[in-house]
């Protein structure tokens, strides 16, 4: 039987870049042309094999509107990974991405895996952000970079597979600490009671 690891992943980025569409495509293999903006955050899960483990992604899709920005730390706190999404047809969304990365580096978990997703690559004829720029920036911060299209299901699975590969495997010899909770029978000492 394969071990299941729960990995909290948050998606960050401007409103309208396609965060919810990426999550829907990954989890449900569905694209909604009329998707509404996320209010606060939404949550979905999907389990995928990775080596001799199963990774259960606990995906928090955060709202991109400025008024919800202050809620973001609540979602990326304790995350194993963050996907920062920008729209390849909107240069401003790439600049905002850098603010998210700065915030993650200052306030996020120390060893968080970062992935940059340049979404809407199906619209490359109206591209404003060259892939070269995204690759150079990703390399400078030690992040994965993938161009995706939630609409056409391009590189969505590859994005999450890349994150899975960056997560260090559990060390079963590490003092028995697997990052989980140990459950077992505990006998009460004579004369000691709970309350």
From Swiss-Prot:
* Protein name per its UniProtKB record: Ras-related protein Rab-31
Which transformation does this protein catalyse, written as a reaction? GTP + H2O = GDP + phosphate + H(+)
What is the taxonomic lineage of the source species? Eukaryota, Metazoa, Chordata, Craniata, Vertebrata
Q: Where is this motif: Switch 2?
A: 63-79
Protein's membrane topology: Lipid-anchor
On subunit structure and binding partners, the annotation says:
Interacts (in GDP-bound form) with RIN3 and GAPVD1, which function as guanine exchange factors (GEF). Interacts (in GTP-bound form) with EEA1. Interacts with NGFR. Interacts with EGFR. Interacts with OCRL. Interacts (in GTP-bound form) with APPL2; interaction contributes to or enhances recruitment of APPL2 to the phagosomes; interaction enhances Fc-gamma receptor-mediated phagocytosis through PI3K/Akt signaling in macrophages.
Alphabetic keyword roster: Cytoplasmic vesicle, Endosome, Golgi apparatus, GTP-binding, Hydrolase, Lipoprotein, Magnesium, Membrane, Metal-binding, Nucleotide-binding, Phosphoprotein, Prenylation
Summarize the protein's role. Answer: The small GTPases Rab are key regulators of intracellular membrane trafficking, from the formation of transport vesicles to their fusion with membranes. Rabs cycle between an inactive GDP-bound form and an active GTP-bound form that is able to recruit to membranes different set of downstream effectors directly responsible for vesicle formation, movement, tethering and fusion. Required for the integrity and for normal function of the Golgi apparatus and the trans-Golgi network. Plays a role in insulin-stimulated translocation of GLUT4 to the cell membrane.
Query: Which residue ranges does the UniProt annotation give for the motif Switch 1?
Result: 30-42
